[in-house]
């Protein structure tokens, strides 16, 4: 019997991939990466949309205590299929490490400079702290479950129920679609007049 995380990872793929499958989009390009942290290198995974031509908006995925497990990697891959350059640290980050990662993502050659953060499990508590940090270079955030109280935010934050917390595919799909629509809207380049 598959684990709950395997089920949720599969659900992410089912929620994110139908449109991709219909359009026959190429899968995301995924690789292990290192980037500069505060006094040491950080390690994780990067997923780049397979359809990407030029820089794309970026998303930092903050997972729970398990770090880059199967569930978190499925989430990062699904975000890349949705059109976002995605960074998933291998282990949970401190606030300073997360801010360094946001700075690195904002200036990464694959990214547009617009960066969001998505938190799941224990990683969701860091989203609120980052959204209040003036030096985070953050455009918006999405919290799936997790922390109920957060500091006053300087950027828009979308709070959604925990993903994978039940067996209601319709509710899960609705939350996923809300998150993708929110990220797409918030990470759009400024309109020229």
Where are the regions a protein language model picked out?
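C-terminal catalytic histidine-bearing segment of alpha/beta-hydrolase fold enzymes
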Residues: 158-193
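Primarily recognizes the serine-hydrolase "nucleophile elbow" in alpha/beta-hydrolase
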Residues: 103-153
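Short amphipathic alpha-helix adjacent to the substrate-entry channel of hydrolases
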Residues: 70-89
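N-terminal export signals
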Residues: 1-22
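Cap/lid segment of the alpha/beta-hydrolase catalytic domain
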Residues: 88-97
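Short beta-strand element of the alpha/beta-hydrolase
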Residues: 55-64
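N-terminal cap/lid segment of alpha/beta-hydrolase-fold proteins
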Residues: 22-51
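Serine-hydrolase catalytic-loop signature spanning alpha/beta hydrolases and amidase-signature enzymes
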Residues: 66-68
């Amino acid at each position: 019997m598959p684990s709950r995380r395997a089920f949720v990872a599969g659900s992410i793929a089912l929620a994110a991939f139908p449109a991709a499958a219909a359009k026959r989009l190429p899968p995301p390009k995924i690789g292990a990466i290192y980037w500069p942290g505060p006094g040491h290198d950080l390690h994780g995974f990067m997923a780049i949309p397979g359809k990407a031509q030029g820089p794309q908006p970026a998303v930092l995925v903050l997972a729970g205590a398990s770090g880059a497990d199967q569930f978190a990697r499925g989430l990062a891959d699904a975000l890349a299929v949705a059109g976002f350059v995605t960074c998933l640290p291998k282990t949970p980050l401190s606030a300073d490490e997360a801010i360094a990662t946001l700075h690195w993502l904002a200036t990464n050659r694959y990214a547009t400079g617009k960066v969001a953060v998505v938190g799941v499990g224990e990683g969701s508590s860091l989203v609120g702290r980052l959204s209040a940090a003036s030096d985070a270079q953050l455009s918006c955030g999405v919290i799936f479950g997790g922390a109920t109280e957060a500091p006053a935010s300087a950027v828009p934050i979308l709070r959604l129920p925990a993903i994978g917390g039940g067996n209601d595919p319709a509710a899960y799909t609705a939350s996923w679609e809300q998150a993708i629509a929110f990220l797409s809207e918030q990470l759009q380049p400024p309109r020229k007049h």
